[in-house]
Amino acid sequence: MTQFIGSIDQGTTSSRFIIFDRQGDIVASDQREHEQIYPKAGWVEHNPIEIWRNTQHVIAAALKKAKLKASDIASVGITNQRETTLLWDRKTGAPLYNAIVWMDTRTDELVSRYTKDGGADQLRAKTGLPISTYFSGLKLRWILDNVPGAREKAEAGDALFGTIDTWLVWNLTGGTEGGIHITDVTNASRTQLMDLSTLQWDEDILRLFDIPSACLPEIRSSSEVYGEITLPSLSGVKLAGILGDQQAALFGQACLEPGEAKNTYGTGCFMLMNTGEKLVPSNYGLLTTVAYKLDGAKPVYALEGSIAITGALVQWLRDNLGIIRNSSDIETLARTVEDNGDVYFVPAFSGLFAPHWQDSARGIIAGLTRFANKGHIARAALEASAYQVREVLDAMVKDSGVEITELRADGGMTINELLMQFQSDILDVPVVRPKIIETTALGAAYAAGLAVGYWKSTKDIVENWQVGHRWHPRMSAEESTRLFNAWEKAVQRSLGWIE
């Protein structure tokens, strides 16, 4: 009797394979980091071959830890870092260039050209997205324009475009020997090439961006049997779920009703609110996106606030400044001071995402005096995540007209008690961490399990969700308002830094 579901979680810094049981509990997992490549300022790349090699490794290692074989796995789902873009040779399987990562800003000149001609919001009605360096379409355009032979191969159908999910699916299902070239609606919605209403590639946008349709994958639902895995360790297992990482976390957090919201604290922060089958356009700097689409059902949409730098700021303090040895030391250092000492850190390393969408912003530390020490800087770095989330939540309430009664939180930074309490204080709502914090991988597992009947319905997902910890607001409204207003002043100082 098959008892388990596998989930490939391919993130910005590492690849993991996690095996779940019917209750959504983790049976075994394995993780392997990959190199972050920085060829120039603002450029961030990954080696797709390294990611594929690491994926194979973690699958085999997790199965070995659990003492399981392929026949014990009912199906496998994939969740992935979104927007990260690559183009590879259909015949050889070799990437034509490294994967260009979601936070990479090399397309800023293209963005400037298009926004000058038609404004940043000219594609919002169709795609839900502003023209930005963030999304895949212009990253693909950059590859086509700058990699010798790429455009010719793409136009001939000899080069395949994909986000990371597409690359993994193609390799898992045979690669050059019959690999399936697909993506799901959630990942497609982040390319800025798909119409949110039709869930198809939009010919007008393809013409505008000068992208040949011959290189694009087929768009499928988030939960259906796509094919069988050919990898020896999972040979014959059905590949049955794909969700972009933030949509997967929404699904794994059981935010399945309109108005329910989650926030993932990782390299960046990503808050999504379920808006049901209704497409809600944003007037306050948020993104409209596809939350998920189950096989045969109507799509469910979401509002999203994307924040580029949160956990990455802690890594920067560790790697670039050396004021902490391990990322986990940040809370201890921040607790050496009673408050932020009126120091504010705006981590606009690659501009500001939601709700500002200012590519020209750059990071600043404001409010420094001789009194400030590294404890204040550590605390300001943590608080920066919470302030940015407050900005997004305020915009979400304005767009949706729905007051959020609690925020479901997940991701690596939720183990930081100081941050979670401050987040509850600055939002003035409870923050809830679930019992299982690996909600991104769990969401992909749920999508894959539903497709093969392992879980009968989304009701099973709701019943599996359990509270791990709940933080309640303890700060006065006057104090939280004072702190947030000072943060907003610091943000204004960061804007327009790049001419």
From Swiss-Prot:
Record InterPro entries: ATPase_NBD, Carb_kinase_FGGY, Carb_kinase_FGGY_CS, FGGY_C, FGGY_N, Glycerol_kin
Regulation: Inhibited by fructose 1,6-bisphosphate (FBP).
UniProt-annotated binding residues for ATP: 12-14, 267, 311, 315, 412
Entry keyword annotation includes Nucleotide-binding: yes
Binding site for sn-glycerol 3-phosphate: 12, 82-83, 134, 245
Positions with a binding annotation for glycerol: 82-83, 134, 245-246
Pfam family, one: FGGY_N
GO biological process, one term: glycerol-3-phosphate metabolic process
Keywords assigned: ATP-binding, Glycerol metabolism, Kinase, Nucleotide-binding, Transferase
UniProt GO cellular component terms: cytosol
Origin superkingdom: Bacteria
EC number: 2.7.1.30
Pathway: Polyol metabolism; glycerol degradation via glycerol kinase pathway; sn-glycerol 3-phosphate from glycerol: step 1/1
Entry keyword Oxidoreductase: no
Binding site for ADP: 12, 16, 267, 311, 412, 416
Task performed by this protein: Key enzyme in the regulation of glycerol uptake and metabolism. Catalyzes the phosphorylation of glycerol to yield sn-glycerol 3-phosphate.
UniProt protein name: Glycerol kinase
Organism expressing this protein natively: Brucella anthropi (strain ATCC 49188 / DSM 6882 / CCUG 24695 / JCM 21032 / LMG 3331 / NBRC 15819 / NCTC 12168 / Alc 37)
Phylogenetic placement of the source organism: Bacteria, Pseudomonadati, Pseudomonadota, Alphaproteobacteria, Hyphomicrobiales
Gene this chain is encoded by: glpK
